[in-house]
Design a protein with these regions (language model features):
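C-terminal edge-of-domain segments
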Residues: 142-161
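Short, low-complexity, polybasic intrinsically disordered segments
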Residues: 111-115, 145
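RNase III-family endoribonuclease catalytic core
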Residues: 2-112, 122
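Glycine-rich, mobile lid/loop segments that gate access to catalytic sites or pores
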Residues: 118
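Short acidic, Gly/Pro-enriched loop/turn segments at secondary-structure junctions
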Residues: 138-140
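Pyridoxal 5′-phosphate
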Residues: 131-135
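Short acidic capping loops at alpha-helix termini that bridge into adjacent secondary structure
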Residues: 125-128
Length: 161
């Protein structure tokens, strides 16, 4: 069986008057992430990791922020489309390991809902999706609560034909 690994990263600025979406779910917070789409940094990092593992460029190539088609789009749609793009090339997701960096809100209570939301979009079980939350101990832009970042590593497997 052929396997590959990809790594993804994304970051967005926190701003007022926006909803906060992380891992496909809406989280109550006083600020939201600024972006062309819903700015879900976790999903964007996972998409980049998937595309990188398959040597299919990156999320901006497939879903450019210059396109009106993707303005305000739900990132869950982008994740499902990314899963489909990989399947067209014969790849399945094996597992995901991701980390979200944010001072606030506290994210650990939301991780089970994130896993339940994301797993079916990638055709994997919740056991195949690891999501962790951490802070930067008040260092840098995330420490100053100016933004949220996410990192993801994805293993993909070549489908048997």
């Amino acid at each position: 069986m052929k396997i590959r690994v990809g790594m993804g990263y994304d970051v967005h600025r926190l701003v007022p008057n926006r909803h906060l979406f992380l891992g496909g779910i809406k989280i109550n917070h006083t600020l939201g992430l600024l972006g062309h789409s819903d700015a879900d940094v976790l999903i964007h990092a996972i998409c980049d990791a998937m595309l990188g593992a398959a040597n299919m460029r990156d999320i901006g190539y497939h879903f450019p922020d210059t396109s009106a088609q993707f303005e305000g789009i739900d990132s869950k749609i982008l994740l499902k489309r990314t899963t489909d793009l990989l399947a067209e090339k014969g790849w399945n997701v094996g597992n995901v390991d991701a980390t979200i960096c944010a001072e606030h809100p506290k994210l650990n209570p939301h991780i089970p809902a994130m896993k339940a939301c994301l797993a079916p979009l990638m055709n994997v079980t919740q056991e195949d999706v690891s999501i962790k939350a951490t802070t930067t101990e008040k260092l840098g832009f995330t420490g100053r609560e100016e933004g949220i970042s996410a990192y993801a590593v994805v293993l993909i497997e070549k489908m048997n034909k």
